[in-house]
Amino acid sequence: EGYDTNLIGNGTDATVVEADEFDRSFLHLHPNIACLISDDADHLDIYGTNDAIKSSFAEFAAKISDKNTLFIAQGIENINGTEVSVNGTAVINAYNLRFENGKRVFDLDFKGEKITNIKLLMPGEHNVLNASLAFAMAKTYGLSNEEIKSGLDSFKGIRRRFSYKINTEKLVMIDDYAHH
């Protein structure tokens, strides 16, 4: 939110892409670091079967040679990577979820390292999972815990993904292009 563009560049050698499986276009990417949030039966009009979707995700995951740089939400089966969970048992696990001063706050067990008081402006346990996956990728890229926490704390979300249009005591209107 607030950038008025879908591409932000500052001359670094990193590019962050939200890849969509809709038309199999994500199979044209060759990432060094990636995450898989879900392999649900979606876009059956394109894939035909759930098995075809899962095969596509497996093909994408196979492009990442170092499985230490592939992060997957706990529960995704038959793909090797580092599991991430919320209140789960993964090696990277968000826990102690709470609200403080209108923000979602949580702690993260990152492979035995306890990282506390990670703050998000966005509600929802699914956003804690998204933030945990983003944290794992950013840390793997070399950012410090404090740099990542600062970035998450200031991230306003993506336009039309649970965007408040009206937020008063009497009326709340949310624009959410929820296609899943």
Predicted segments with their positions:
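Adenine nucleotide phosphate-binding catalytic loops in nucleotide-utilizing enzymes
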Residues: 47-54, 80-180
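Short acidic loop-to-helix transition motifs that present clustered carboxylates
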Residues: 1-3, 157
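Flexible active-site lid/hinge loop adjacent to a nucleotide/diphosphate
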Residues: 3-77, 121
